[in-house]
Amino acid sequence: MIKSKLVSLDEAVADIADGSKVGMGGWIFNAQPMALVRALIRKGARNLDLIPTPGSIAPDMLIGAGCARSTVCVFISFEQFGLAPHFRKQAEAGTLKVYDLDGPAIAGGLRAAICDLPYMPIPDLGTDLPRHAPEFYLPLPSKPGERKMLAAAAVKPDVCLLHAQQADEYGNVQYLGSPFFDAMLAQASRKVIVSVDRIVSTETIRRNNHLTKIPSAMVDMVVEAPWGAHPSASPSLYRGDEKHLKEYVKASVSDEAFSAYLKKYARDAATQPAYLDALGGARLGTLTTSESNLT
């Protein structure tokens, strides 16, 4: 009999050791694994090496909460709200080690990990990034007139945190929007933890098998966390919460205000229902979108 992989948020992050390399799925303000991030903060995680592809509030919150020591990323952005406040603050202060890579290096590094190779060839874009992050770039020889190439070092997370719209209890994960880099990140990682807005029946998964982007064999744990990407969007289910993102940015101005923010929305909100209560149901109702896929 197939074993259920359904666990609680706290159970999902319990074995993530300090010093782990943590991949983070989604794309900026879409499908950020926020419920899992808040669980990591409650756990008191430390010295994590974050690998967002690319991220926004999820890695920034971990950085601000003192959970991270480094990032390997293309960028961490708050787009229309400015630069990611804690990422910027700690990068400028030198308390966060930042490995700044280009897109081909991240993608090539994940592909190398998937293939169990130390490197993967990528085009040389002519930037100075290889000089600043030599651990991740190896020059390759080329003849006159040939395209210059580099070898991107493997990027292999110890664990990756993803958020999708639905899955069954066995970990067959379905996306009602773009999966972004999530499937590649899952293949490259040693352990895969996925939060979903809802658990559905295996029959629903079979009936809509074209939506399955990450099969059960690749997933170690799945967590049912309604609104688990909030305040980022979960495509086809709810929009990003700009009001809350502004609240986060405002709270990030001072250590005292940010500590109060974390207390309210992460440390005191020990479960996902408690987090939703802190937000208010009326607020969430304004963010719901219409679905276009079967469930």
What kind of region is each of these model predictions?
Residues M1-T295:
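Conserved alpha/beta enzyme-core scaffold
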